[in-house]
């Protein structure tokens, strides 16, 4: 209907925009939730994950600077593949130290980092995996 490619089921698609209108998009989401009690987007299951991929060769001991930084970018991948490979989510790729050197373009895994996992973001990730991943946290 909209001229976008979908998966084989026809239910899922992704749209790329080379810009982000947060000032407009955020207001629409807030007003929709407040006035209509409706979300502008609500996942029904854990289908996909955005994982950290190296922008350049990184050395052991380097600290990742997260989204918008100089060390990693986010790559969308199926949740099952992300969980089974223990890929590092892009949202958790800030202020973590590499325990091994990683070549440009490689997905960073949990085995590649040393991170303080007591922060709330890490705890929320663990709860999400326990709730939405068959068999719980991987």
What is the predicted role of each segment?
Residues 1-137:
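C-terminal catalytic/substrate-binding lobe primarily of soluble NAD(P)-dependent oxidoreductases
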């Amino acid at each position: 209907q909209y001229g976008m490619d979908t998966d084989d089921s026809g239910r899922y698609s992704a749209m790329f925009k080379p810009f982000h209108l947060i000032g407009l998009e955020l207001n629409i989401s807030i007003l929709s939730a407040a006035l209509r009690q409706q979300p502008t987007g609500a996942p029904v299951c854990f289908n996909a994950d955005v994982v950290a991929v190296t922008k350049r060769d990184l050395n052991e001991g380097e600290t990742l600077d997260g989204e918008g930084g100089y060390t990693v970018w986010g790559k969308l991948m199926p949740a099952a593949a992300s969980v089974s490979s223990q890929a590092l989510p892009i949202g958790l790729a800030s202020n973590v130290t590499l325990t091994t050197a990683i070549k440009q373009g490689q997905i960073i895994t949990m085995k590649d980092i040393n991170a303080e996992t007591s922060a709330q973001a890490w705890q929320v990730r663990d709860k999400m995996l326990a709730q939405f991943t068959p068999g719980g946290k991987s």
